[in-house]
Amino acid sequence: MVVFATFTSAGVVRRALTQAGFVVKRFPALLEKRDDARLEKNMTLLVEGNYAPWNRLAASATSPNVIVVGAGIAGASTSWALSKQGFNVTLVEKAAEAAQEASGNLAGLMMPALATDQSSFAEYFIQAYLYSIQHAKTLAQSHQFNFSQTGIIQLAFNDRQQTRQKNWLELEHVADLLEWVSQEQVMALSGLDFSCSGVYFKEAAWLSPYLYVKSHIHACKASINCLFNCYVNQLHYEQGLWKLYDQHQHLIAEAPTLILANASDATRLLGQFSSVLPLSLRTVRGQVSALENHARISQLKLPVCYDGYITPVINGKII
């Protein structure tokens, strides 16, 4: 039951509200007005607003069964989120355990990908960053994965980066995310002598991706089905179901909803559907090197980004 009261009892207002499904009742006046109105309606309240595109959730599938392929950061966090919403999740991974490829790096940075405008696209990345930081902090309270919210410095190491940072600093909606730091401040914050200024993302963090993935799976292990050592050789879509087959044509799993979180291997699986699913997928190269600890570098207090990035020592290694 939804009840409203208003001093407005004009006929045009009452008729419009009646057409909208409300029961309008007139009551004796308060103060000097002749009539007041009270409105009642049994309804599920739906408020239409200026929702960002990523907040408009599609209607749920008729079946709560979902398959997620790939047990890295994307697959594990998606499985965790879906299980919290009551979905029956089957997580399929070709390796013997989770986070065996890029998500198994020793260290990963959590910092915003900023644009120089205020588009919905730019806002999405800001909100994703803020959510990720808060989610990691909450998860770290019950699971250990070396979460360090030290902040991160992005050096203004060339003219292009200096221009980008100047544009960032002029945007009001990101003012709380970063601050300009001089060369001297960079040295004080980082512990090393760098030759340029930069911006300091004060809420940014770094963590162990491998343990972060493991924490997600452990947090929902009672409500998801993990299938390791399962290589998905082919996808079939038959009668509303996605069916996954291994290299021996044995059925691995089937469900009406399929989520591919297996990096570049998704292009192989979707190749046969290119005519009906014309997705623009491309492989992005990435490379991380782990170096032995060095006495001077060991003084680094927080991650510093330039054309790449460098982290403090973790497990005796510098990333």
Task: Tell where the protein language model's regions lie, with residue ranges.
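Short beta-strand to alpha-helix junction loop
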Residues: A5, A122-A128, L155-Q161, V199-H218
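Dinucleotide-binding Rossmann-like beta1-alpha1 core, especially the glycine-rich loop
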Residues: A107-L189
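Conserved beta-strand positions in the Rossmann-like core of class I SAM-dependent methyltransferases
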Residues: T90
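Rossmann-fold NAD(P)-dependent oxidoreductase module
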Residues: A16, A81, S215, A219
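Active-site substrate-recognition segment that forms the wall
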Residues: A37, N42-T62, I67-Q85, K94, ...
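Helical element adjacent to the flavin cofactor pocket in flavoenzyme catalytic cores
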Residues: V199-H248, A253, A261, D265-T267
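C-terminal substrate-binding/active-site "lid" region of AdoMet-derived donor-dependent transferases
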Residues: M1-T44
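Helix N-cap at the beta1-alpha1 junction of Rossmann-like dinucleotide-binding domains, i.e.
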Residues: G11, A96-A98
